[in-house]
Every structure is written in C-alpha cells, then in structure tokens.
C-alpha cells in the first residue's frame, strides 16, 4: 500500500521507520526527519522484532499523519519515483528478498497449514 498525506509530495513530509538494521542503505529514519530528495527502494529489518511496529509519514504543513502498523519482521519501503513522489510504498514482509536462497526468516508450512499476516493503515 502507498501512504500519502492528501497527495502532497512526500519530499515535504517527515518519515519515521521502525528499523534496527538496514540491509541496503546507510540512511535511517529512526526519528522523524524530512524525506526531502531521499530515494528509498530498500528492505529493512524491523524493530522491535516480533512486536507491533509503525511506519509514520507526517505532513507538518497539513498537521496530519498517515501510518501503517504491523508485526512482520521485514519491511519494504519505496519513495514512489514513478508516481511523482506522491506516495510512499510500505510493504510488511515475512522475509527479506532472496529468502528462498538465503533461508533467512522463511516460514515453512506443511500441507494444509496456513500463515496469516495483518496490517493496519490509518490517519491522524
């Protein structure tokens, strides 16, 4: 899903990510900071592990925030360059990219077993 603050360009918004270690980039948004021209298309390990976390994008000029909450251990974030940066893609994930080869965080299901994941999107 894409988070947006009334389709305002995300460059003017502040972002907070629940990351403990970043797998692809050296920039962290562990405290609210302006996205500006930062391009993100990366996977992050979430923090705290196995607990609910929140990605929050805030528009100071509109005094509003949108957020996504989940408890998955991984998170994909994309700054939407192909969409004129009008939204921030946030995808909770059960494992990092290439997990079938690395085996990291794979969930093994026996025939007939199920695995469910949930997330919540909201605005304030």
Positions of PLM-derived features:
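Sterically constrained small-residue positions within well-ordered secondary structures
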Residues: 48, 68, 81, 108-110
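Active-site/ligand-binding surface loops and adjacent short beta/alpha elements
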Residues: 1-70
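Beta-strand secondary-structure signal
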Residues: 54-56, 89, 116-120
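Short Pro-Gly-centered flexible turn/kink motifs
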Residues: 108-124
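Glycine-rich active-site loops that engage anionic ligands at enzyme catalytic sites
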Residues: 56-97
